[in-house]
Amino acid sequence: MVNYSFSRELRLLTPEDFKPVFKNAVPAVSPYLTLLARKNTLDHPRIGMAIPKKHIKRAVGRNRIRRIVREQFRHQQHQLPAIDIVVIAKAGIADLSNQEINKILDKLWRKLVQRCNG
């Protein structure tokens, strides 16, 4: 049985976790989201999010984006290599439906896997 949990070990939590990803990252970009990835020394992927107030004013909107990204990551974690990922939201993402955001994320996960394995 495959475990689809989202435990603490699957998250980037501290600034020290985020810094290496920002320093030299493999990007996957769309008009609404940017995913930055970097190989890690663990045997599983980890994710962190940067959802700026500048682009999504209300906490409800920022939390909706976080929930969607988290859920997608939970289901994709077994297809992803051992990488650290930072998801950055851009302006206009709050206007998209959940299905549109899911489609964008699907494409970006595939791009990241190609670029990190290739």
Swiss-Prot record:
Which cellular component terms (GO) are annotated to the entry? ribonuclease P complex
- Biological process annotations from GO: tRNA 5'-leader removal
State the SUPFAM superfamilies in the record.
Answer: Ribosomal protein S5 domain 2-like (SSF54211)
EC number, UniProt record = 3.1.26.5
Q: State the superkingdom.
A: Bacteria
| Keywords linked to the UniProt accession | Endonuclease, Hydrolase, Nuclease, RNA-binding, tRNA processing
Q: Name one Pfam family in it.
A: Ribonuclease_P
User: Which GO molecular-function terms appear in the entry?
Assistant: 3'-tRNA processing endoribonuclease activity; ribonuclease P activity; tRNA binding
Give me the reactions it catalyses.
Answer: Endonucleolytic cleavage of RNA, removing 5'-extranucleotides from tRNA precursor
Show the PROSITE patterns listed in the entry.
Answer: RIBONUCLEASE_P (PS00648)
Xref: HAMAP family: RNase_P
Its subunit composition reads:
Consists of a catalytic RNA component (M1 or rnpB) and a protein subunit.
Q: Which family does it belong to?
A: Belongs to the RnpA family.
Function of the protein = RNaseP catalyzes the removal of the 5'-leader sequence from pre-tRNA to produce the mature 5'-terminus. It can also cleave other RNA substrates such as 4.5S RNA. The protein component plays an auxiliary but essential role in vivo by binding to the 5'-leader sequence and broadening the substrate specificity of the ribozyme.
Do you know which PANTHER family this protein is assigned to? RIBONUCLEASE P PROTEIN COMPONENT
Record-given protein name:
Ribonuclease P protein component
Q: Which organism is it from?
A: Psychromonas ingrahamii (strain DSM 17664 / CCUG 51855 / 37)
